[in-house]
Amino acid sequence: MMTIDFIAFYNKVSSIALNFPGTIASTSYRTPAFKVGKKMFARFKEDGKTLVVYTEERDKWMKQDPATFFITDHYKNYPAMLIDLAMVSKKDLKQLLFTSWQIRAPKRLLKK
């Protein structure tokens, strides 16, 4: 997974995610992840260029740009979506990471 692209993608995601209260860099399923409290809210897939986030609006995102926002059968029954980090804008990535953080964050952090 350690490629030049992955390093750039990791830096892109971490520069946003680590600014949210209570966020730590961690791992999940042996890949880099970001957690709030003990809950993962974003993680890299094994390919190093796809990110998993939680969202309640995935249909909207996938309809808007199916090349960038998608799911696999594994995520069909979860409120999660995959993001192609080579395609996503920084604005959309920031919005999706923040929404995912809000879904997973403890209530005490949401008040900050």
In which residue ranges do the predicted regions lie?
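Charge-dense, helix-prone N-terminal extensions
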Residues: M1-K112
